[in-house]
């Protein structure tokens, strides 16, 4: 069994840097990171990590989740 804390933290850092370029939808983030070999479940855990650390806003509009830096 693999310890995932390191991978989640690494993914959180990658997401943070993506968001420095502006807000993105959850599906945009997943699509970008999937091309780099990141797992969608890990991406969601990393977003939770960033939200818990109060680094991002997680917003819901009519059809999608929007993530942006605070």
From Swiss-Prot:
Name of the featured protein? Uncharacterized protein MJ1608
* Pfam families (alphabetical): DUF2582 (PF10771)
């Amino acid at each position: 069994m693999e310890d995932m804390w390191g991978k989640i933290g690494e993914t959180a850092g990658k997401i943070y840097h993506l968001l420095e370029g502006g807000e993105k939808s959850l599906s945009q983030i997943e699509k970008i990171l999937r091309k780099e070999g990141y797992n969608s479940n890990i991406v969601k855990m990393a977003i939770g990590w960033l939200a818990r650390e109060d680094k991002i806003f997680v917003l819901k509009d009519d059809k999608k989740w929007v993530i942006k830096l605070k």
